[in-house]
């Protein structure tokens, strides 16, 4: 049985110390695509966290009964089933956001973070620790998405969650939105800057040279 200290480390470690995007550079494609608005970034964070946490839990419960030769197929079947459930829930209760996220919810099936944690962690770790690891990695993923989404929506459109924050020139205000921030390449540069900031703060994350 895991103690509170271990659970806390598993839950909080992926936020900065072992962030799946900033340190492991996983899940970057969806991060580029869904961060033009805070709403889509938040919903994608919740979707991935739910899938990652529960896939870890179910795979961990079954880990001693899964033949090694078919473990990847079993993992993907569990992940795909959860993604279908999440996608159907989004389409039922948040249809507009589901349309904006388009195929990226479905692509959680092949997200490196989800598959990586299932194979590297859940297959070797008890259920509770695996579940908390899934939540922690989802939060770490979301921390980057929401940081990038905050900058892109605020300075690219003058709003947050669709609510105007900076009064735009076109509406008689003072702020001229930077349309470049709404384009996917801007997310790439912002994520790069966040990685630089985190690795400056924690230099032990920098890869050894040579």
Swiss-Prot record:
Catalytic reactions of this protein: a ubiquinone + n Na(+)(in) + NADH + H(+) = a ubiquinol + n Na(+)(out) + NAD(+)
Entries under InterPro entries matching the protein: NqrD (IPR011292), NqrDE/RnfAE (IPR003667)
Main location as per UniProt: membrane
Source domain of life: Bacteria
Transmembrane segments: 14-34, 42-62, 72-92, 103-123, 131-151, 178-198
An MF annotation (GO) of this entry: oxidoreductase activity, acting on NAD(P)H, quinone or similar compound as acceptor
EC number(s) stated in the UniProt entry for this protein: 7.2.1.1
Membrane topology term: Multi-pass membrane protein
Swiss-Prot/TrEMBL keywords: Cell inner membrane, Cell membrane, Ion transport, Membrane, NAD, Sodium, Sodium transport, Translocase, Transmembrane, Transmembrane helix, Transport, Ubiquinone
Cell compartment(s), UniProt: Cell inner membrane
Gene Ontology CC entries for this record: plasma membrane
Gene Ontology biological process terms from the UniProt entry: sodium ion transport
Pfam families: Rnf-Nqr
Disulfide bonds: none
Role of this protein: NQR complex catalyzes the reduction of ubiquinone-1 to ubiquinol by two successive reactions, coupled with the transport of Na(+) ions from the cytoplasm to the periplasm. NqrA to NqrE are probably involved in the second step, the conversion of ubisemiquinone to ubiquinol.
Subunit structure: Composed of six subunits; NqrA, NqrB, NqrC, NqrD, NqrE and NqrF.
Family membership noted in the UniProt record: Belongs to the NqrDE/RnfAE family.
Protein name per Swiss-Prot or TrEMBL: Na(+)-translocating NADH-quinone reductase subunit D
Organism phylogeny: Bacteria, Pseudomonadati, Pseudomonadota, Gammaproteobacteria, Alteromonadales
Name of the encoding gene: nqrD
